[in-house]
Swiss-Prot record:
Record has Transmembrane as a keyword: yes
Family per similarity comment: Belongs to the HAK/KUP transporter (TC 2.A.72) family.
Keyword Ion transport annotated: yes
Annotated HAMAP family: Kup
Protein's UniProt name: Probable potassium transport system protein Kup 3
InterPro entries registered for this protein in UniProt: K+_transporter, K_trans_C, K_trans_N, Kup
Catalytic activity: K(+)(in) + H(+)(in) = K(+)(out) + H(+)(out)
Compartments where located: Cell inner membrane
Protein encoded by which gene: kup3
PANTHER family cross-referenced by the UniProt entry: K+ POTASSIUM TRANSPORTER, OSMOTIC STRESS POTASSIUM TRANSPORTER
Functional description taken from the UniProt entry: Transport of potassium into the cell. Likely operates as a K(+):H(+) symporter.
TM region(s), chain numbering: 20-40, 61-81, 106-126, 143-163, 171-191, 212-232, 253-273, 291-311, 343-363, 372-392, 400-420, 425-445
Organism: Legionella pneumophila (strain Lens)
Membrane topology category: Multi-pass membrane protein
Alphabetized UniProt keyword annotations: Cell inner membrane, Cell membrane, Ion transport, Membrane, Potassium, Potassium transport, Symport, Transmembrane, Transmembrane helix, Transport
């Protein structure tokens, strides 16, 4: 993975910057880049449809342009990208950074987790609305083809999710060039419309948007629901910071994506000013009829790429949440050795597929899906703005007035969009919100239950001296082997080691008590990844440090000890891990009974520790324990 700090040193003539910028077009800008397929059409529909007047057209496109400027260009590109957690971006990385360095952790964590949960909620809609809006171009080609739109969209989505386990590293190399061609195409089509009606360029003046917003009462307010669709993919600009760095993301945005989007929206507005019908997708009406089918194919490919970015982002965010202790262990499969971000999480993939297909079939068209789309993303952006304000004031040391003025502008814009999108709640907006609440509850329950178990285990801590005294008094036999006892918490002597000695009356002459420590930073320096101290009598205490973007692999880590001259044979190690059986009594302790029951269910279905840490099955002993909560 390229370091952000190194990328910042690149200049415009550096081929690495150009390569990374091209790649960023394929990963970062897929969602926001395909928004022209449905945004302007939705805005005009919310404004009353039919034949809109000049003020409506100019005001609508002006609002879209300035939303792209304020939210995408200023908030995310100019500010958010500068606040990274050791090179990583996104709301979970920002939450971890702030909670690590500041007080008021419960508030920061609550805001960050809710923002992350909301991303999952709207992430189920993005593939559905994107693919449907692309395939709906067939209706312009021939009205009789409208009956094939839904089956084709469903087939594409099923195929997309089905191939995830195989990895997308090979075809992923084409994402950047394809999206570059996509942006060039929509930019040229838009410019063609602008040339036909250059008056539309006046919409760059924000006065048109403000006049329309404040002079049309409820209509001006409701239209913000449609306007917001142009930036639903803006959160990806920040979330993918660690993959590319600030410079390539900015270069791709200002060099191609942003001007192409502006021209396309202006071109669609120009077309409607010329009297084009708003009954069909305005985006496709920019294209000459001879090139309509190739454009539909290109649009479909672009929306598939946008959907792939959403799926990959969900995998990455899930891994972050697991490493930070907010979700149970899930099976993570590395699908390519070429990139750390090439992973697959089956549970997440099939959850997204079922939810996306359900929404696609249930709503049936991009127009109806737009009624449910945006509410969760607008709430996520509010959460990000709250954390940005804290970062500006506490990390950048800006005074509270300056921080408030900058964040206040973003807050006003974000709150306006969120308030407008709340009107979608009954029409389908409740779906992503409900999903977000479920996921947030899962994260809260898992973390709460995990802390409860940790407290109970800590109460039974045994010191090294007392343990050594006991094995000497009881005449425990030491055998020439190496044993590794894994524990998730720092303990002098973990319960599984005590149990092993009591039951077997034998102990290996080399014992490593390995504590897995998940850090609140994305990556741990290789020199700091493994720390080991000998406590005497052949017992070592070791700490394995992993960042929230890293996948633990214990055998590989222990090879470092062998390479450093420690007297251990990696092929002759026996791993001891605890297998807790959690049960609930009708006694109230730190968790309500129903929360406890849900935690027990999640715990039983979590991936076994041996699988998660890549331990060789033939060398693992699981020691069962019952824990009451």
């Amino acid at each position: 993975m390229p370091s952000t700090r190194n990328i910042e040193k690149l200049n415009d003539s550096n081929p690495t910057l150009r390569t990374l910028s091209l790649s960023a077009l394929g990963i970062v800008y897929g969602d926001i880049g395909t928004s022209p397929l449905y945004t302007f059409k939705t805005v005009i529909l919310l404004a009353g449809g039919g034949t809109p007047d000049v003020n409506t057209i100019m005001g609508s496109v002006s609002l879209i342009i300035w939303t792209l400027i304020i939210i995408a260009s200023v908030k995310y590109i100019s500010f958010a990208l500068r606040i990274d957690n050791d090179g990583e971006g996104g709301i979970l990385a920002l939450m971890s950074l702030l909670s690590l360095k500041l007080k008021h952790r419960p508030f920061i964590i609550a805001v960050g987790l809710m923002g992350a949960a909301l991303i999952y909620g709207d992430g189920t809609i993005t593939p559905a609305i994107s693919v449907l809006s692309a395939i709906e171009g067939l209706e312009i080609l021939s009205p009789s083809l409208k009956y094939y739109v839904l089956p084709i969209a469903i087939t594409i989505l099923i195929t997309l999710f089905a191939i995830q386990s195989k990895g997308t590293a090979t075809i992923g190399k084409a994402f950047g060039p394809v999206m570059a061609f996509w942006f060039l195409t929509i930019g040229i089509l838009g410019a063609r419309g602008v040339i036909q009606h250059p008056f539309v360029l006046a919409a760059i003046n924000p006065v048109y948007g403000l006049n329309f917003l404040f002079s049309n009462g409820a209509t001006g307010f409701f239209i913000l629901c449609g306007v917001f669709l142009c930036v639903t993919g803006a959160e990806a600009l920040y979330a993918d910071l660690g993959h590319f760095g600030t410079a390539p993301i900015r270069c791709a945005w200002f060099g191609l994506a942003f001007p192409s989007l502006i021209f396309n929206y202006l071109g669609q507005a120009a077309l409607v000013l010329e009297g084009a019908s708003t009954e069909h997708n305005i985006f496709y009406m920019l294209c000459p009829s001879d090139f309509l089918l190739p454009l539909i194919i290109l649009s479909t490919v672009a929306t598939i790429i946008a959907s792939q970015a959403i799926i990959t982002g969900a995998f990455s965010m899930t891994r972050q949440a697991m490493q930070l202790g907010w979700l149970p262990r899930l099976r993570v499969t590395q699908t390519s050795s070429e990139g750390y971000g090439q992973i697959y999480i089956g549970v997440v993939n099939w959850f997204l597929m079922l939810a996306t297909l359900g929404l696609t079939i249930g709503f049936g068209s991009s127009e109806k899906l737009a009624a449910a789309y945006g509410i969760a993303v607008s709430a996520t952006m509010l959460c990000t703005t709250v954390l940005l304000f804290i970062a500006l004031h506490k990390l950048w040391k800006w005074n509270i007035i300056t921080s408030g003025l900058v964040a206040g502008l973003f807050m006003i814009v974000d709150a306006s969009f969120f308030a407008a999108n709340l009107t979608k709640f009954i029409n389908g907006g409740y779906i992503p919100i409900t999903l977000a609440i479920i996921i947030y509850s899962m994260m809260y329950i898992w973390h709460k239950g995990y802390k409860t178990i940790a407290i109970k285990q800590k109460e039974k801590n045994i010191t090294v001296d007392s343990f050594l005294d006991s094995i000497q008094k009881e005449g425990v036999v030491r055998v020439p082997k190496t044993a590794v006892f894994l524990t998730s918490k720092e303990q002098d002597i973990p319960p599984i080691l005590v149990w092993h000695v009591k039951k077997n009356r034998v102990l290996q002459d080399k014992v490593i008590i390995l504590n897995i420590n998940n850090l609140s930073i994305p990556w741990c320096k290789p020199a700091d990844q493994l720390q080991i101290v000998e406590t005497g009598a052949g017992i070592w205490h070791a700490v394995a440090n992993y960042g929230f973007m890293e996948q633990p692999h214990i055998p590989k880590l222990l090879k470092k000890l062998e390479a450093q001259g420690y007297d251990i044979n990696i092929k002759d190690i026996t791993y001891y891990i605890g297998h807790e059986t959690i049960f609930v009594r009708n006694v109230r302790h730190t968790m309500s009974k129903y929360i406890k029951i849900l935690f027990v269910f999640m715990h039983r279905n979590a991936l076994p520790m041996s699988n998660y840490f890549h331990l060789p099955p033939e060398s693992v002993f699981e020691i069962g324990r019952q824990i009451e909560i």
